[in-house]
Amino acid sequence: DIFFQHSGSMQCAAVAQATHSPYTHCGVVFIESGTPVVWEAVGPVMRTPYADWVEHGVDGHVVVKRLKRIELLTPGVVAAMKAAGERDMGKPYDIYFAPDTDRIYCSELVQRIYRSGAGIRIGEEQRFGDMDFSGAEASRMLKDRFGERFPADQPVVTPASLFRSALLVTVDSVGSAPTIMR
């Protein structure tokens, strides 16, 4: 499953404005020793117990999405997905959302786990230039990170793109989605 939330960080406020979506953070959930654990990119790529992950979001709101064709996720495929995620464990967070593999951001990690482990591409990449940076937080983040060298053609996959994927179905939602400020 893929968990989505809105984090209270300044970056997440900017991502919400740029993507017009309240879903600004995501991770892949695996069951480890009978407990749900979220594999996420937040500092280093790491495993976070579900209860801790929920606390990092706004008002405990979480949406759980699942692959519509769940039968594709056989035990062997899930093992391959975990192996794909393991390769990124400990890597630093990518504040520039660059399409390399040295640093990882949250939605990139999710997409990589599904693509490398299951051969399934969830979410569509878009160009930075196609996002809306007119909001105050989004504009500030863009200027702080890139200065005058805005990479308009740089591909990026956002939590919003993953959330909208036609390959996924919502299976649970807890709490209310926050309102995004534009």
Q: Which positions does each model-derived feature cover?
A:
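Cysteine-nucleophile amide-bond enzymes
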Residues: 1-182
